[in-house]
Each structure stands twice: as structure tokens, then as C-alpha cells.
Amino acid sequence: MAQDLIKEQLQGVNLFLIGMMGSGKSTVGPLLAEQLGYRFFDADVLIERVAGKAIADIFAEDGEDTFRDLETEVLGHLAAQTRSVIATGGGVVLRRQNWSYLHHGLVIWLDGSLELLLARLQGDEARPLLQVENLEERLGNLLAQRQPLYAQADLRFPLQADQDPLAIAGELLATIPGLLKPQCSAEQN
């Protein structure tokens, strides 16, 4: 019942999940979408489909700029959708053009601490930006660079190490109506 009310208040607006790699966007996103009766899209999966290769291969063969171009292209298509929860890549916030697409929906920042991200990403060989000798230093630098950009989100959701993804989705659902009320009031004035 509460989900029906939230769906009505959202009026089909997309939810964009942003945050560092390892913050759980691709895990929480489908749960949130299911509870809302929305579709779920993982931008990284779509980028791989468009490119016809894995993200690691895009970085290795074509470079980060090509990956970011594909990311912007895919995000533009996703922003045109409605009733969707979209898990974005961690660096989506780096390009100003991407923000014009993100602002077509509600932007939710899943904010994980450096310690939490380190624990989740240790030994992950699929992420090209993390193939370095000092993972903690690399993650810390990326986090410092991106935090001010993530802070532009409509909602910051601080993550705890022991949180269940389903509980996170539930807490987000409970928070969303409070974000929408001011938007509705502003439109009526």
C-alpha cells in the first residue's frame, strides 16, 4: 500500500543511484525497482552491450575517454525512460552533461565510507580503475575527487557495513516522499 502511494507521488520519475564502485547500486537497484513496480537498468551492463565488450576491455583497448563517451550516450537514452531505477557507474558524476540527464529524475547517493568500500572491493579484478598497487590510496583519491560531485544528489544515504540491501531499499522508499513534497509545492506556486 505504501509503495502504491509512493509510486503515485513519483509520477513515473526515474531514480538514479550514484556513488562509488562497491556502494551497492547494482544490488539495491533491482530491489528498489521491484518494490516500486519499476524497471531496473544497470548502466554498466548497457555500456558493455553497446560496446560489445567488457568495461575492462573498453578501458584497456579504447581508453577511459571512450568509456565516458559511451556512458554519456547510454545515460541519455536511460534519462528518456520513465518508471525506471538506474544504477550508474561511479564516475558518471564527472561530466557536467551527465548531470543534465541525471536531473531528469531523483538522484540518490549511496554513500559508503572508504573502509566499507575497501572491504567490498578488495581483490576485485573486474574494475579497471582499481588495478593498482595501493588500493586504499587509489580509492581514497577517487572518493576525494567525487564526493563534492556526489553531494549534488537529491538524497544522500550513508551506508553501514552490516546493512541488508533489502533494508536499504525499504529505508530509501520511506525517505522518498519527503523529497517529493517540496517539488510538488514549488510547482503549484
Swiss-Prot record:
Its EC number is 2.7.1.71. It catalyses: shikimate + ATP = 3-phosphoshikimate + ADP + H(+). GO terms for biological process: amino acid biosynthetic process; aromatic amino acid family biosynthetic process; chorismate biosynthetic process. ATP binds at residues 22-27, 127. Its cofactor is Mg(2+). Mg(2+) binds at residue 26. This is Shikimate kinase. It comes from Synechocystis sp. (strain ATCC 27184 / PCC 6803 / Kazusa).
